[in-house]
Amino acid sequence: NDDMVWQLKNKPAMEHASNLGAIIADAIAKPLGIPAFIYDGVTVDEMMPILKITGLKELSRKGIGHNLNTRAAAMKYAREHGKEYKDCKLIVVHLGGGISITLQYGGKVADIINDEDGPFAPERAGGLPSQDLIKYFGQSGMTAKEMLKKMKSRGGLVAHLGVNDSREVEKMIENGDEHAKLIYDAMALNVAR
């Protein structure tokens, strides 16, 4: 509806290409006089309220991450094993430019460790030591917008190795690059723990 389109254009929960889906659907549907629908929005927050609480009352965790991919994978798993998705208890991991780890049960994404508070990824910085991050930001001369861009698109493998493609990192390792192996192993270990 118009409220959703306004929200996505003016105050999105996060900056992401998927925000365009509802806007494009609305632009196509309105002139034709037909309804437009989106399914399984990327910012649907089903996280258990108790899991949103942090050590600062002004800040809370958000149930935003790679929900579309992880939910689809969980549903596929349930289908392939003759189960109802709502009856499954699963941990599902999305490995892409960002990494999200989800706990799914009762037909919902009940908890998520997303690319802001979890492991670093090919492009994302992941969770960082908060005091060091605050000091670094204060000394960096960057604006908040520049810092967020660095953390979202120039962190992780890009920051350490200059590439965001795991296949390139694997080639570096095959060619004997010990630093690339260390960084890749660190990323894998962060996902596993």
Where are these predicted regions, by residue range?
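Adenine-nucleotide phosphate-binding core of ATP-dependent small-molecule kinases
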Residues: 149-193
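Gly/Thr-rich phosphate-binding beta-strand-loop-beta motif of the actin/hexokinase/Hsp70
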Residues: 1, 88-110
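Glycine-rich phosphate-binding loop plus the immediately following alpha-helix
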Residues: 23-26, 38, 58-87, 97, ...
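Short, well-ordered secondary-structure micro-motifs
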Residues: 49, 103, 159-162
